[in-house]
From Swiss-Prot:
Keywords: Ribonucleoprotein, Ribosomal protein, RNA-binding, rRNA-binding. The lineage of its organism: Bacteria, Pseudomonadati, Pseudomonadota, Gammaproteobacteria, Pseudomonadales. NCBIfam families: PRK05610.1 (NF004123), uS17_bact (TIGR03635). It comes from Pseudomonas fluorescens (strain SBW25). PANTHER family: 40S RIBOSOMAL PROTEIN S11 FAMILY MEMBER, SMALL RIBOSOMAL SUBUNIT PROTEIN US17M. One of the primary rRNA binding proteins, it binds specifically to the 5'-end of 16S ribosomal RNA. One of its GO terms (cellular component) is cytosolic small ribosomal subunit. CDD domains: Ribosomal_uS17 (cd00364). HAMAP family: Ribosomal_uS17_B (MF_01345_B). This is Small ribosomal subunit protein uS17.
Length: 88
């Protein structure tokens, strides 16, 4: 029996921390409809992602994908930097 290919989970978010070596913290925001009131509410999640070359900085918009656990709290890896933060 042929083994089915797994779909890779990818998310897009903003880098909120790059202080760790080869690790970034990405803020993922999503809109969820409230079950009773019907209003759309912002919900957010912070994920640690592996950044092998330390190329990301705070404010960058990035795409990350799920991977095997690399540390206690790190199981995502950087795929692409979509938009660089504006340097002041």
């Amino acid at each position: 029996m042929a083994e089915a290919e797994k779909t890779v989970r990818t998310l897009t978010g903003r880098v909120v921390s790059d202080k760790m070596d080869k690790t970034i913290t990405v803020l993922i925001e999503r809109r969820v409809k409230h079950p009773i009131y019907g209003k759309y509410v912002k919900r957010s999640t912070k994920l640690h992602a592996h950044d092998e070359t330390n190329q990301c900085h705070i404010g960058d918009k990035v795409t990350i994908r799920e991977t095997r656990p690399l540390a206690k709290t790190k199981s995502w890896a950087l795929v692409d930097v979509l938009e660089r933060a504006v340097e002041v």
